[in-house]
A protein has these predicted regions:
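Hot-dog-fold acyl-thioester-processing enzymes
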Residues: 2-87, 149-153
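HotDog/MaoC-like acyl-thioester-processing domains
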Residues: 1-14, 92-153
Length: 153
């Protein structure tokens, strides 16, 4: 297994793209997450979900967001200092379903070096999580803190 390259602000450029590994969303995991964090009937029960606006079991949007974060941390955004957010916008254009295989694609859309803290900058990243049919199920535009490469590295 190869080690993921750890990137600093100095390594990044606008238009740079990253692709994560994949994750299989299972019905049992949807229900487990929902039972603890988003206990609404359409996330917990197939019959209730079928009668809902979703017309079938759907993962919580927060579960979908958590999976996206896992994929980004596991190599989808290999920033040396981790993924440290300053804010952003989220959308869920389609529900995530049991059996979906999810993958995140990200693009750097802006880099702003800090004037007051020259050792860091803010990087704006647009990430889209797709299912196996290339349907977008999660959109995130985030402002992230990224450090410059330390001297000698």
């Amino acid at each position: 297994m190869s080690e993921v390259q750890q990137l600093y602000l100095d390594d990044l450029h606008v238009g740079q793209r990253f692709t994560s590994g994949s994750y299989l969303m299972e019905a049992a995991r949807i229900k487990e997450f929902a039972a603890e964090f988003d206990p609404q009937p359409f996330h917990l029960d197939e019959a209730a979900a079928e009668a809902s606006v979703f017309r079938g079991l759907a993962a919580s949007g927060w579960h979908t967001a958590a999976v996206a974060m896992r994929l980004l941390v596991a190599g989808g955004l290999p920033f040396a200092n981790g993924i440290i957010g300053f804010g952003g916008e989220i959308a869920w254009p389609k529900p995530t379903r049991p059996g979906d295989t999810l993958q995140v694609e990200s693009e750097i859309i802006e880099i702003t070096p800090s004037r007051s803290k020259p050792q860091q900058g803010i990087v704006t990243v647009r990430s889209t999580m797709f299912n196996q049919d290339r349907e977008a199920v999660y959109l995130l535009t985030a402002k992230l803190l990224v450090l410059r490469r330390p001297r000698g590295k």
